[in-house]
Amino acid sequence: SSNLGAGYVDNSGPAGLSQSLVDNYLNADGTPIDPADGIFKDFNLTFKGRDGRLLATVMHSNCKFKSTSPESKSKAMLVEEYSEENKSVVRPPYLTEGGPARNATGYHIRMSIDTTYVSGQGETSLPMIRYAEALLAYAEAAEELGKCTPAVLEKTLKPLRERAGVTYADPSEIDPNFTDFGYAISANLQEIRRERRAELALQG
C-alpha cells in the first residue's frame, strides 16, 4: 500500500516518533538504557534486547508486510535510502525530501498498521480503554495517596512488564536519564509514568 511504501505518517504532513519515546523503553533485563551509550547510534542495535513493546511500536529491520510488488508477497523493511524505483517496500525514514511522505524524526510508526492488505484499505481495532490503563491508574492513584506498596506494584506494573518480556524489579533508584518534569518524583512514580508511556504510546 502507498502508506507502507512511504512509511506510516500523518497524511497532512511529516510525522515520526521521538527519540525520547524510544529511550523510555527498558532493556529486557529491566534496566534503563543510557542514551549516551554509543551502541544506540546503531539503528539495529537500538532494538536489540529491549522491551518487546518497543518493537511493536517502532518500525525496525525485518518488519514484514504484504507488498504490492508482483515478484514478492512479503518484503522486509530494508535498511537503504528511499528510492523512487521501489515504492512498494517499507523502507527506513524518508528524511531528505518534503511532502507528506517525509519522516520528521527517523523513527517510523509500526503500531496499528494492518500488515495483511495491499490495496490501500484495511482495518485495525481502536480500544476505548484497556485493562492495562486501569492497572496504571490504580498504581498512580495509590502512589499519590502514599499507599503504593510493593504488593500494589506486583499486581499492576509487574504483569504488564512480564507480558512484554521485561524482567520486573521493585523500583528503588531514580533513573537520571528519565524525563525531567521540573520537580522531584519518587522512584515508584517514575516507573509508573514510564510504564504508562511504554504501554499506551500512540493510543490516545
For each feature predicted by the language model, list its residue ranges:
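Acidic/polar-rich alpha-helix caps and helix-coil junctions
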Residues: 1-19, 23-204
